[in-house]
Every structure is written in C-alpha cells, then in structure tokens.
Amino acid sequence: KVIDIHAHIYEKVAGITQGQPMSSTSQGKVTIGNREIQFLPPSFERSCSTAEALIAYMDWCGIEKALLMPNPFYGYHNYYFKESVKKYPDRLRGVALVDIMKGKAAAEELAQIYDEGILFGMKIEVDSTFQCAPGTRLADPKLAPVWDCCEQYHQPMFIHMFRREDIVDLELLAKTYPHITFVICHMGADICFR
C-alpha cells in the first residue's frame, strides 16, 4: 500500500500568510494583501485544488489512500474536508483545523467535529497561526481549552513548528497531556526562513 500522509485540498484559497489575507483569483494566482502572485501552475484555472483532482493524481501515481492535511495558509476548510471524506471514504481521511486563538470556542468546535466522527486530530501551523498574535506560544494558558479537548477525545495533534521555543513548549504539552499523540511535521523548518 502507498499512502500519502500530507495532501492538501481546498475549494478556494481563503487563508492568511505574512499576517495578511490571502485569496484565490484565477489561473493559479492568489492575492496576498494588495499584491497578486503565481501560487499554483496556470492550469489550476480556479486557483483551487479539489478532491477530484487529488483522486486523479493518486490514481495516476498508484496511491491508495491520502490523509487530508489542512493549513490556515489555505483557509479553514473543515466542511469541504468532511464532504470529500464522505464522498471518497475508502480513499481519504481528514484532519481538522480550527482557529486555536479562539480558545474555548475553538475547543467547542473541535468537540463537535470529533462527535461527528468524520475528521480526526487537529493541525496547527505555528507560524501562520501566531503571526496575528505575536508573542503567543503553544503553551499559552489561553490555548488550554483546545489541548484539553484533544486530550479528552484522545486525538492526535499534527504540528508544523517553525520556532525554537516551540520545542520547549511541545515538551511541556506532551508531559501535561499524555493522551495526545503529537506528530511533528517539518521539524526544523525555521532554518529555511531565518
């Protein structure tokens, strides 16, 4: 079996990067703030990456299953992930994404997602998430409701860490929340950006 454990799909780009809104235009282009950049190949006419396109690429490459991995860079697409997983249940699984900066409201959204039983876990992109809240750290007490929810439901946490202090915080979280499996994606990526 070949499984892609890090696939992205989105109906449109509606996220945030560099502290600015990012949105789809056409021919693979997106706007970031007031400037337009080529984000995808021009063949991506609507500047989106659909579940159907992913399934076609998977078939072409001989990939049996894929794990849909969200990112605030593209926007919050839990609904699209859920619909795609329901449409292709033998091919796709999906990880949830919530705005953890909302604290208790984010935890309530996660609990609802977990109760539905379609998506699992949670993804956090530290750099994108905290750009809008400088000085916030993974172990910040205002984020505790989110970690408490993941702990209660025994859900894994997929983390893209970009900052050295995230390692210290992750160690503290792992000791505090023993029922959360922390999956580190792209360890050491901050070196590329400094």
Regions found by a protein language model. Name each.
Residues 1-137, 141:
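Mid-domain alpha/beta scaffold segments of enzyme catalytic cores
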Residues 120, 136-194:
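Catalytic pocket-lining loop regions of alpha/beta-barrel enzymes
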